[in-house]
Amino acid sequence: MSNTFEESLKSMSLDYLNLLINGQAFSDVTFSVEGRLVHAHRCILAARSLFFRKFFCESDPSQPGAEPANQTGSGARAAAVGGVIPVNSVGYEVFLLLLQFLYSGQVSIVPHKHEPRSNCGDRGCWHTHCTAAVDLSLDILAAARYFGVEQLALLTQKHLTSMVEKASIEDVMKVLIASRKQDMHQLWTTCSYLIAKSGLPQEILAKHLPIELVAKIEELRLKSSMPLRSLMPHHHDLTSTLDLEDQKIRRMRRALDSSDVELVKLMVMGEGLNLDESLALIYAVENCSREVVKALLELGAADVNYPAGPTGKTALHIAAEMVSPDMVAVLLDHHADPNVQTVDGITPLDILRTLTSDFLFKGAIPGLTHIEPNKLRLCLELVQSAALVISREEGNNNSNDNNTMIYPRMKDEHTSGSSLDSRLVYLNLGATNRDIGDDNSNQREGMNLHHHHHDPSTMYHHHHHHF
């Protein structure tokens, strides 16, 4: 009897979902999201979401139970006259996932495995706990709260709670901030514990978290007797040692900001300042000029390939993310490794190729509009050339016959791919977005992928406007 009941519910869920997949079939409301039309049904949306119920009532005061409209924006007016309702508060992918949950009561909030994402440089990633997966879940959480779909919000919180156990500490910090904003106590507890356990000093935490959250993390550490920094040997001297280190780091950064590399040199020689542990090179790449970075490297006290933080990014990873040819060039001149990998196996070349792919096939995406195509092309060529030189040197230095047969093939393949990438970048960077095509088929295609593969398959671009 129970199985029959479950099958009946599943069948009904699929029937409702097919209404959404088929787009215009019996549709009586149309939304415009990121230039694409989404066809839906008022009765289902109103029954499942308090937000939509109020929205449709405000747009049609003659409806039974309609409440007086406090605000009648362009969306409400469009709904009243049967026009297209613009949606600017969420992206197309997240909006479709939200509707999928409203229609069927089920949704997969994990990106499609191996799908290229703008915020994941690993082409073979399964997107189970990477930055792309975390960002999508956070966007769904915000959308669920905005549209009053509490069941989806709770489902997403549960998913994030299990995800952060394997996520990078930077992503855990993002989730912590969101859990505080969305008042998700369980998620807050999990994230704050993970960050406290990480041992990152206040100086690093303050770069990613509001000061009041840093204070709460420190309070949790004191209550739990967690070490503030694993490199500090004496438990009873943690506070004083941290204060001294923080003072050194602040002085060093002020010196770098004023291009006073000589003062940094004196701090290294006289005060024992560790440029790697203080992330001096990372800070200089992010905030200073090429000349300062060059002078800092020429001191000989900083490891150009030092893996910083829990993610293991090097200065070259940061320069690649910034799309700064000047920084990329000066780092490569001082023997930065273009093949060095983060904890997640991502190289600087992976980052640049992912950014290039976004420009080639999707146009300048939101959040990356500051990137100049020519600079991206130059960065890619510089890093590719450096990787090719290393590949050739390894091939020439290898005396094994088998290896000498293998290396040229790798080199040729790499050269071909690099050349093709460069030509495509040169010809196509900065191209406009692809034609949108038929909106109804887009909706059907997007929903079919979610329905059959149980995960999203369209790129989501971050927006922060209002519905």
Curated annotation (Swiss-Prot):
The keyword Cytoplasm applies. Belongs to the plant 'ANKYRIN-BTB/POZ' family. 'NOOT-BOP-COCH-like' (NBCL) subfamily. A zinc finger (C2HC NPR-type) spans 117-131. Signal peptide: none annotated. It holds the Pfam family Ank_2. It comes from Arabidopsis thaliana (Mouse-ear cress). InterPro entries: Ankyrin_rpt, Ankyrin_rpt-contain_sf, BTB/POZ_dom, NPR5/6, NPR_central_dom, SKP1/BTB/POZ_sf. Residues 27-111 form the BTB domain. This is Regulatory protein NPR6. ANK repeats lie at residues 247-276, 277-306, 311-340, 344-378. Pathway: Protein modification; protein ubiquitination. Zn(2+) binds at residues 120, 125, 127, 130. GO terms for cellular component: cytoplasm; nucleus.
